[in-house]
Amino acid sequence: MQLTQQLDLFPECKVTLLLFKDVKNAGDLRKKAMEGSIDGSLINANVIVDPFQILVAANKAVHLHKLGKMKTRTLSTEIIFNLSPNNNISEALKKFGISESNTSVLIVYVEDGDKQVHQEHLVSQVEGQQVPLESLPEITRLSEVRKVCSTQPEEVSR
């Protein structure tokens, strides 16, 4: 149902990915994330082709966090920002973060040593169905990926 990966460069850190579909409260989740009451990144699953994208973005975010050189204020936002091919934070949040209309949401959180995330509490806030991460290809919309990443059709393949 989920993917949890220990980061090679930071073995004390684990990244967990949770995928949801048929989400009915994306607007509420977004609001909670902006208030800081959700401990994780809320990502538009329609624009993610492979979980590896998330792991790369999370690894970079943790690295910059440890160096004190993040470009955003929170680790969760830094992960979303690192998914973007450009350097505009607000544009990255619009394209890769969730919006009120999203029905597929990927939640990503980082646990660092003693800092644990209460996954049950996080999952209970989502009004939708948690699905295995292997379902991501069915959720990905390649037309949206091409649009947000400014790619040509032949550049996006599975």
Swiss-Prot record:
Localization terms from the record: Cytoplasm, Cytosol; Nucleus
SUPFAM superfamilies associated with the record: PF0523-like (SSF143870)
Matching Gene3D superfamilies: CGI121/TPRKB
Keyword Plastid: no
GO terms of molecular function: protein kinase binding
GO terms for biological process, alphabetical: tRNA threonylcarbamoyladenosine modification
Source organism, top-level taxon: Eukaryota
Cross-referenced InterPro entries: CGI121/TPRKB, CGI121/TPRKB_sf
Keyword hit for Nucleus: yes
Entry GO terms, CC: cytoplasm; cytosol; EKC/KEOPS complex; nucleus
Keyword line: Cytoplasm, Nucleus, tRNA processing
Family in the record: Belongs to the CGI121/TPRKB family.
Subunit relationships: Component of the EKC/KEOPS complex composed of at least GON7, TP53RK, TPRKB, OSGEP and LAGE3; the whole complex dimerizes. Interacts with TP53RK/PRPK.
Annotated function: Component of the EKC/KEOPS complex that is required for the formation of a threonylcarbamoyl group on adenosine at position 37 (t(6)A37) in tRNAs that read codons beginning with adenine. The complex is probably involved in the transfer of the threonylcarbamoyl moiety of threonylcarbamoyl-AMP (TC-AMP) to the N6 group of A37. TPRKB acts as an allosteric effector that regulates the t(6)A activity of the complex. TPRKB is not required for tRNA modification.
Stated name of the protein: EKC/KEOPS complex subunit Tprkb
Record lineage: Eukaryota, Metazoa, Chordata, Craniata, Vertebrata
